[in-house]
Each structure stands twice: as C-alpha cells, then as structure tokens.
C-alpha cells in the first residue's frame, strides 16, 4: 500500500513536536541519534521499538554501536516521509523516555 508523501510544511510541523529528530539533508527521511547509559539500555530500546515497528508494519533503518542507536525513517514505497514515519518516531520517543535517553 502506498502512503501519501508529506509536504515540507507538514514535515516541519510534525518535527517540531518531536525532540531530537531532524529532516535528512535530501528531505527524504527523518533521522535521530539516541544515546543511552549502556548497551543493555540501547538494546532494550531497540527491542521495544522493533515491537512497535512490527505492529505498524513499518521498519526503521538503524544501527547500534554500544550505547548509541542511529535511526533513519523513510517510507520507501512513497519515496519520502509519510505519516507512518512519524507514528514510528513517536513510538521510539516513548521507548527511549523510560531509558534515560
């Protein structure tokens, strides 16, 4: 299913409601780096985020090195940022909040 790509103004407005997220230089994704106190906290965040991603059927591009997790969200079918990216970003914010990020 193809989801409508958000207009730049809608992306800026949605980003203003999320702490630490920004628009990638090419405008095709939103990105954030999370820093936790330990690898276990980072991995717990990833596990909780993975469950949210499965529920939304929308999966992140991400990498983990020790206590840091870098995330890139885009909707490949729409070739840009959609509401689904923001739904997953919000879920990730909640997952990080309880982990001292």
UniProtKB/Swiss-Prot annotation:
The keyword DNA repair is assigned to this record: no
GO molecular function, one term: 4-alpha-hydroxytetrahydrobiopterin dehydratase activity
Stored Gene3D superfamilies: Transcriptional coactivator/pterin dehydratase
Native organism: Agrobacterium fabrum (strain C58 / ATCC 33970)
One Gene Ontology biological process: tetrahydrobiopterin biosynthetic process
Entries under CDD domains matching the protein: PCD_DCoH_subfamily_b
Official protein name in the record: Putative pterin-4-alpha-carbinolamine dehydratase
UniProt-listed Enzyme Commission number(s): 4.2.1.96
């Amino acid at each position: 299913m193809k989801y409508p790509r958000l207009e730049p103004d809608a992306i800026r407005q949605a980003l203003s409601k999320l702490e630490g997220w920004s628009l990638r230089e090419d405008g095709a994704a939103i990105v954030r780096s999370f820093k936790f106190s330990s690898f276990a906290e980072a991995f717990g965040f990833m596990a909780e985020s993975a469950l949210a991603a499965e529920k939304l059927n929308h999966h992140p591009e991400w990498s983990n090195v020790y206590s840091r997790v870098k995330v890139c969200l885009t909707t490949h079918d729409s070739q840009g940022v959609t509401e689904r990216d923001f739904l997953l970003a919000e879920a990730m914010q909640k997952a990080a909040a309880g982990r001292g990020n």
